[in-house]
From Swiss-Prot:
Biased composition (Basic and acidic residues): 36-60
Intrachain disulfide bonds: none
Function: Involved in pre-mRNA splicing.
InterPro entries: Slu7_dom, Splicing_factor_SLU7
Upper taxonomic lineage: Eukaryota, Fungi, Dikarya, Ascomycota, Saccharomycotina
GO biological processes: mRNA splicing, via spliceosome
PANTHER family: PRE-MRNA-SPLICING FACTOR SLU7, STEP II SPLICING FACTOR SLU7
UniProt GO MF annotations: pre-mRNA 3'-splice site binding
Record's keyword terms, sorted: mRNA processing, mRNA splicing, Nucleus, Spliceosome
Entry's localization field: Nucleus
Record note on quaternary structure: Associated with the spliceosome.
Region (Disordered): 36-74
Name listed for the protein in its UniProt record: Pre-mRNA-splicing factor SLU7
């Protein structure tokens, strides 16, 4: 490409060629330069002059009527001038009127009156007997106050049940210590339940309810194992390329024997059979360990160590606790010998034990008091 093609000449509006080597600060006339009409007509560089609209304006000089565009908002019967200055744009209550809230309050009052009418109608339909109402009038009470929990009903039952034992008494008499939860501020027995995430005391299941819950869990576990087995078989058939059995892969067959609600008797028998199998396997494992390592003679308790307190009897009843409810010793108590009125060890003096009745320190000696 030649140099002439690179630098093509430029022409102004009058058709004269523009010299590209003249700098801009020389060719361009500043905006503050006073121009005359003759200069404008003879100016061959007028196309490079700054536009009048782009020239800087002197705002210190008042210019009435320019740039004024007032906007008004008509609300109701008044005209409000719309002024969006810095503060009004950031005012959260700008344009708020109290009349809007009055309309909302009126709507709420209408809804409240409708509810009150329906409530009064239901109260009139389910009113109490005349004798009960007359008695309330004599006592200076109103049935509406009682229903709204403003006053206590004097005719309400106030006698406590005999079997209603306070929780603090149960905690004192029980072997477990009082358990206080500082988060929920509840004093509960942890053996009877627990406090959940919603700050509610949930009782543990006992008796028939616990057995039913265990049976339901057993049914769920059996159903889960069967589903896993079906999925494994379907995956193996897919790998081997075998076709599904009759009914197709989309047909789902439910085993009613694994449903607690459909067949509870069968589920109970299965659970019992499963428990017997586990117990048999446990006993077999235990016997194998004993046969391998020995020590079977220590598994069965000897008669010499079977509850020594039960062998110590007075008459036909075993002596386990005294009259105060305290646990007795394994040795005989209140068994006076050699005409003593106290037992050996009831007296101590000079580092020696003795009898409290005669102050003797020789054991199995006859009492000298009588």
């Amino acid at each position: 490409m030649s140099s002439q093609e690179k630098h093509k000449p430029e022409y102004d509006s009058s058709g004269k060629e523009v010299n590209p080597y003249i700098p801009k600060f020389i060719s361009a006339v500043p905006w503050y330069h006073n121009k005359s009409n003759d200069e404008k007509s003879d100016d061959y560089l007028s196309h490079q002059r700054s536009n009048v609209a782009d020239e800087a304006k002197d705002h210190s000089i008042p210019q009435p009527g320019s740039g004024i565009n007032d906007e008004f908002e008509i609300k109701g019967e008044t005209e409000i001038k719309k002024v969006e200055d810095y503060d009004s744009k950031r005012d959260r209550w700008h344009g708020y009127e109290a009349q809007e809230w009055d309309k909302i309050a009126e709507n709420w009052d209408k809804i409240k009156k409708k509810k009150q009418k329906t409530k009064n109608a239901s109260v009139e339909e389910d009113s109490d007997d005349t004798d009960y109402e007359l008695e309330l009038v004599e006592l200076g009470l109103d049935s509406k106050d009682i229903k709204n929990n403003l006053k206590e009903d004097p005719l309400e039952k106030t006698i406590r049940d005999r079997q209603d034992v306070p929780a603090y008494i149960l905690n004192i008499t029980s072997s477990n210590k009082i358990h206080y939860d500082p988060k929920s501020r509840l004093t509960k027995d942890p053996s009877k339940g627990f406090i959940n995430d919603k700050n509610q005391f949930v009782k543990k299941l006992t008796g028939e309810a616990k057995r039913l819950d265990n049976l339901q869990k057993f049914a769920w576990e059996q159903n889960r194992q069967q589903e896993e087995m079906k999925q494994r078989e379907a995956f193996e058939q897919k790998l081997t390329g075998k076709k599904h059995s009759e009914g197709g892969p989309d047909e789902y067959q439910v085993d009613l024997n694994l449903n607690m609600e459909a067949n509870p008797t069968a589920m109970m028998l299965q659970a019992r059979h499963k428990q017997e199998q586990q117990q048999a396997s446990h006993d077999q494992k235990k016997s194998d360990l004993v046969a391998k390592y020995g020590g079977g003679e220590f598994l069965n308790k000897s008669k010499e160590f079977v509850n020594v307190t039960e062998s110590i009897q007075t008459g036909d009843k075993p002596i386990n606790k005294d009259k105060n409810g305290l646990k007795r010793s394994i040795y005989p108590e209140d068994n006076y010998s050699m005409n003593h009125q106290s037992i050996w060890g009831s007296y101590y003096s000079g580092g020696q034990w003795g009898y409290c009745c005669c102050k003797q320190t020789t054991r199995n000696s006859r009492c000298t008091l009588n």
